UniProtKB/Swiss-Prot annotation:
Keyword tRNA-binding: no
GO molecular function terms noted in the UniProt entry: 2-polyprenyl-6-hydroxyphenol methylase activity; 3-demethylubiquinol 3-O-methyltransferase activity; polyprenyldihydroxybenzoate methyltransferase activity
Lineage: Bacteria, Pseudomonadati, Pseudomonadota, Gammaproteobacteria, Enterobacterales
HAMAP family: UbiG
Enzyme Commission number(s) of this protein: 2.1.1.222, 2.1.1.64
Broad class of enzyme this protein falls into: transferase
Native source species: Cronobacter sakazakii (strain ATCC BAA-894) (Enterobacter sakazakii)
Name of the protein in its database record: Ubiquinone biosynthesis O-methyltransferase
Task performed by this protein: O-methyltransferase that catalyzes the 2 O-methylation steps in the ubiquinone biosynthetic pathway.
UniProt-listed SUPFAM superfamilies: S-adenosyl-L-methionine-dependent methyltransferases (SSF53335)
Entry's Gene Ontology BP terms: methylation
């Protein structure tokens, strides 16, 4: 697991990084602040693996990997995984957990734009989960992800829709009522409508393949993937192949 020095970063919100650095030591606590990520990880992993035609032997980049929950699970599926993040503390936690778990993967402290400049067309699969709403310029991230994937490769995004229901459920409900995540985790003004995300995708060689909602039922305390993208949603895109 190699470490690379972080570059001079531009598309970075230092306040957002600081929020996650402060709780990084508890990233792998399945009952702590990141419990929802642990709960939804099997759903995300299953969706990505199914839509990408399996992960075994594929070169995968996890953008905004944090403490490595998804990165490590994809590596366990046989993928050659690189996790990318700008948070030093989450990456330190990710590296330590991988070492203790005996999972081989690489973590890099670098912006996705910098990584794209060095590794264009290098990956079979690129994932960008719950990251777009935490950067100043999400459009730039989408463009970089498109540059990183091989022709015919797959890029997955997940984020939160911007509307009253999403604010009520993801901010008021999740942060203040149910206390599923720390207060201040989300800024509803930074949420992204599917039409906006698809507009950015249309500016790249990526094509939409599938979109699905991630739903939480507080009565059953269960998550599921189902139609309806009014709160959380996942988007599967694929890079065009040369004609």
């Amino acid at each position: 697991m190699n470490a690379e020095k972080p570059p001079v970063a531009h598309n970075v919100d230092l306040e957002e990084i600081a929020k996650f650095e402060a709780v990084a030591s508890r990233w792998w606590d399945t009952e702590g602040e990141f419990k929802p990520l642990h709960r939804i990880n099997p759903l995300r992993l299953g969706y990505i693996a199914e839509r990408a035609g399996g992960l075994f032997g594929k070169k995968v980049l996890d953008v905004g990997c944090g403490g490595g929950i998804l990165s490590e699970s994809m590596a366990r599926e046989g993928a050659n995984v690189t996790g990318l993040d700008m948070g030093a503390e989450p990456l330190a936690v990710a590296r330590l957990h991988a070492l203790e778990s005996g999972v081989e993967l690489n973590y890099v402290q670098q912006t996705v734009e910098e990584h794209a400049a060095q590794h264009a067309g290098a990956y079979d699969v690129v994932t960008c989960m719950e990251m777009l709403e935490h950067v100043p310029d999400p459009r730039s991230v989408v463009q970089a992800c498109a540059q990183l994937v091989k022709p015919g490769g797959h890029v997955f995004f997940s984020t939160l829709n911007r509307n009253a229901k999403s604010w009520l459920m993801a901010v008021v409900g999740a942060e203040y009522v149910l206390r599923m995540v720390p207060k201040g985790t989300h800024d509803a003004k930074k949420f992204i409508r599917p039409s906006e995300l698809l507009g950015w995708v249309d500016e790249t060689p990526l094509e939409e393949r599938h979109i699905i909602g991630l739903h939480y039922n507080p009565l059953t305390n269960r998550f599921k993937l189902a139609p309806g993208v009014d709160v959380n949603y996942m988007l599967h895109t694929q890079a065009k192949k040369p004609v």
